[in-house]
Structures are given as structure tokens and as C-alpha cells.
């Protein structure tokens, strides 16, 4: 598939902060093959997009999100963090089913794509459902399973390994997996040690 975007203002985000006005950008099989002020005659596009009065730039990255939480939007507003999280959100999350996370994630992804975000980092519940939504939507993501409840049996550790094996570098590398440190107020020392150990063994983060 060859796509040509013409008459578009390109914000390159390079070290010189260069902006190319009324430019042409050509894409072939998902890769940018040229950017120029002039159209190249030897590029025969299957589709042409007129970018007049539009801006083209690298996609935004959401560096911390819980996409499945989209379905809890506006729940328990106007509270301090401790009351909001421990008294309201965590009890509500205990009732969420895997399919709730799947649909909530798809909703969040659609909103991100609509507003220019093309990659995100996510750590939440039922992460296989999050990964499934990412695979279907075509967005890029770095996903982490929640390791807050490591127990003596190593159950969570095994689940994290399985998640890594099932999803890391899937969808032509669009999906990456890592081991998270969500926050210091939810992690105990053993969780940090086990997360670091897993990441080192799998040569990931």
C-alpha cells in the first residue's frame, strides 16, 4: 500500500525543530519513504490525502495510563487521593470482569488515536485483555502485569513470565512487555526484588 500526503505542514521534532511547509510525505507498506517540498514522479500512490490546513507530526506517547479504567471515568470525583483510591476505586475494581477491561481499553485506545496518541504504557488488571485490544486496534503499547501481590508460591511471578512469553514483541513488534514499578505506596520490598529479578532474567525492563 502506497500513500501520499500532500500540501501538509510537517513538524519534524528533530534537533533543529524544523517545520516543513506545504510538504509531501510518502508512505510505503507502513514506512515513510520520503519527505520533500516537491512530489516525486516515480512514486505512484494507491491513495492520496490532501493535508491542506493540517499539521503532520510524530505521534504522542502516553507514558502512564490504566486504559481499562476508562469505564470508571467520573466515578468518586472530588476526593483526596487516599479516599478516592482506597475507599472507592480499589473496591470498584474488584468487581470488574475481564470483558469490562477489554471494552474499557478499546474505548481508551479510540480516544487516544483520535487525539494523536500512537503509543502508550499501561499497567492494570486482566492485562491479556488489554493486549488483545491493542492487537486489534493497531496502536503501539508497552504493557506490564500488576505484580502487587507476589506470594510465597511465586504465582504472580509465573503469571508475569507467561504474559511476557505470550505477548512480548507480538504484532510485528507493536506490543512490548515489561515489569512495572507502579508506585512506592503500593509496592513492598519483595515485589521490587521479584520484579527486578524477572526483568533481568528475561532481558527486559
Segments the model singles out, each with a brief description of its role:
Residues 1-43, 54:
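N-terminal metal-binding scaffold of metallo-dependent hydrolase/deaminase domains
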Residues 8, 25, 30, 53, ...:
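Divalent metal-coordination and catalytic microenvironments
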Residues 10, 120-127, 185-186:
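Short beta->alpha connector loops
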Residues 22-24, 47, 177:
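Extracytoplasmic/periplasmic beta-strand context in beta-sandwich domains
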Residues 71-103, 137-145, 155:
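Active-site gating loops and adjacent loop-to-helix segments of metal-dependent hydrolytic enzymes
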Residues 130-205:
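Metal-coordinating catalytic core of metallo-dependent amide/deamination hydrolases
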